[in-house]
Design a protein with these regions (language model features):
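Bacterial N-terminal signal peptides that target proteins for export
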Residues: 1-9
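Sec/Tat signal peptide C-region and signal peptidase I cleavage site
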Residues: 17-23
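N-terminal secretory/targeting leader peptides
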Residues: 10, 24-114, 122-254
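Expand to "…catalyze enediolate/carbanion chemistry for C-C bond making/breaking, isomerization
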Residues: 14
C-alpha cells in the first residue's frame, strides 16, 4: 500500500510540475542590434521588469542581431502571432502605421527635449494607439537620437557633396523622398544586408543614430562621418496584438 501511495504522490507531483511549466508563456523578442547595444540593454530591462511583476508566468528568449530576420519580417511575425515582442526603429513603422512617418520629416525637431515632449504628449500617445488597428500593440517610445550620415566616398560639408551618393535608407517613403530631393541615390535595403553591401561597394554609405553607428562598429567599414542630425529617430517597444489580447489585466499592467 505504501508503495502505491508513494508512486501516486510522485505522479501527482509530476503532473503538477508539468501543469506549471505548461502555464508559463514564452516571449520571443527580436531586434536588429547586438545584445550589448541599446536595444539589447532595453530588451533585458523589459524582461527584468516583467518577471519582477509577474513571477514565473513568463519566460523570455532573445533573438538579437536580426536573429529572426529584418525589422519588417519581425513586425509581420508579430502580426501573425509567431513572435511576441520587438524593439524596432520608427523608420520601418510607416509601412504599417503611416502616421509614424511624420517623425521622419527632416529637421522637424529642434532638439531631444522637443522630440521627447511630442512623443510623450498627446500626439505621440495617439500614434501609439493606432498600432492596435494593424495587429500590433505599442507599449512605449524609446530613445535612439538623431540620424547622421556615414560614407566611403567623400566628406560632406555642403548639400552638393551628397550629389549621387548611393546611400542606404530604410524602406520608408519620407526617407527616400528626402535623399532624392538632396540629389543622392537612396537605396532601400534591409539592415542585415548593409555591412556586406558597404564592404563590397554596392552602396557608398548609410544613415543612422550614433547609438547604432557605434554598436555595429561602422567605423571599421566607413571613412567619413557627418553629424547631419537630419532626422530624429525614436525606437518603439512593440508586442503582438494576438499575444496582448491573451493577457489578463495584471499581466498587461506589468508590461
Amino acid at each position: 500500500m505504501k508503495f502505491n501511495l508513494t508512486h501516486f504522490a510522485a505522479a501527482s507531483a509530476f503532473v503538477a510540475l508539468a501543469g506549471s511549466a505548461a502555464a508559463q508563456t514564452e516571449i520571443k523578442i527580436g531586434y536588429a542590434l547586438a545584445p550589448d547595444s541599446h536595444y539589447g540593454v532595453a530588451a533585458q530591462k523589459f524582461e527584468e521588469v516583467v518577471l519582477a511583476e509577474t513571477g514565473d508566468q513568463f519566460s523570455f528568449k532573445h533573438f538579437p542581431s536580426s536573429g529572426l530576420g529584418g525589422e519588417r519580417e519581425v513586425i509581420e511575425g508579430l502580426q501573425l502571432g509567431t513572435i511576441e515582442a520587438t524593439i524596432v526603429s520608427s523608420g520601418t513603422l510607416a509601412n504599417f502605421v503611416p502616421a509614424t512617418g511624420v517623425f521622419d520629416i527632416p529637421f522637424l525637431f529642434s532638439g531631444l527635449d522637443h522630440a521627447r515632449a511630442v512623443l510623450d504628449g498627446p500626439i505621440g500617445q495617439e500614434i501609439l494607439g493606432e498600432f492596435d488597428t494593424v495587429g500590433l500593440h505599442g507599449l512605449a517610445w524609446g530613445e535612439q537620437g538623431f540620424r547622421h550620415i556615414t560614407n566611403n566616398r567623400n566628406a560632406i560639408h555642403t548639400p552638393a557633396d551628397v550629389e549621387g551618393l548611393k546611400i542606404r535608407t530604410m524602406e520608408n517613403p519620407v526617407h527616400l523622398a528626402a535623399f532624392d530631393a538632396m540629389g543622392a541615390a537612396p537605396t532601400p535595403m534591409a539592415w542585415p544586408e548593409v555591412i556586406s553591401s558597404l564592404q563590397q561597394g554596392v552602396i557608398d554609405g548609410q544613415e543612422n543614430p550614433l547609438s547604432v553607428i557605434v554598436s555595429v562598429k561602422l567605423n571599421e567599414v566607413q571613412k567619413y562621418l557627418t553629424l547631419s542630425g537630419h532626422v530624429y529617430s525614436p525606437a518603439m517597444l512593440l508586442v503582438s496584438k494576438p499575444f496582448w489580447d491573451g493577457l489578463d489585466d495584471d499581466q498587461k499592467a506589468a508590461m
